[in-house]
Amino acid sequence: MRYRCPMNCPSLRNQEYRREIMISEQLMGRGIRDPAVLAAMRQVPREAFVDQGMRELAYEDHPLPIDGGQTISQPYIVAYMTEALELSSSDRVLEIGTGSGYAAAVLSRIVHTVYSVERLEELARGARQRLESLGYNNVEVFEGDGTLGWPEHAPYDAIVVTAGAPAVPKPLLRQLVVGGRLVIPVGASSFLQNLIRVRRQGEDDYRSEELCGVRFVPLVGAEGW
């Protein structure tokens, strides 16, 4: 379904219009159906999470560079991973890899609280300031090794990892509630992975399924690369 611009629609340079095109073509057009995810993607201004010089590209469906040699994921992947978490409004979510803070902002529109861990100090500081200035008050950002999770606030209903790991970090598995979901890119290559969803069925019972092929920057840390 293509978004139809009304007669009084602003020009194509208008970011709200571009956001609607993103929703209809990149997300709904590729199978994203969760109303809460679509609403969150509509509410969060991606252009506020990229450098000034990149804002014209904010709603293109590809990653964009941010500080520290990292990237902000393409909108479809953010929506896909968020939908794969099967979230509810009461959930507490752990995000590994804050980056610019965009995905945390999207999550914050759906769930009760988001805890986000970023290993790079400049990114953690920038994301924290950006999220606070934009009013995302249910997000907490911590600078640290994301492969170890954030045990002080565990357990979590859902965990999402935004970098590729050689294997699922055991500390993250232990920080899931029973019934919780973990979505993470995993692969033998540091730049080519399969997106995996792990469900904690019981105290020591975890079931995993492959969702799709993805390409993420490496997950660096004690339990990563």
Swiss-Prot record:
A GO molecular-function annotation: protein-L-isoaspartate (D-aspartate) O-methyltransferase activity
Coiled-coil annotated residue ranges, if any: none
Lineage top rank: taxon: Bacteria
EC number from the UniProt entry: 2.1.1.77
NCBIfam families given in the database record: pimt (TIGR00080), PRK00312.1 (NF001453)
HAMAP family xref list: PIMT
Family, similarity comment: Belongs to the methyltransferase superfamily. L-isoaspartyl/D-aspartyl protein methyltransferase family.
Protein name, per record: Protein-L-isoaspartate O-methyltransferase 2
Organism: Pelobacter propionicus (strain DSM 2379 / NBRC 103807 / OttBd1)
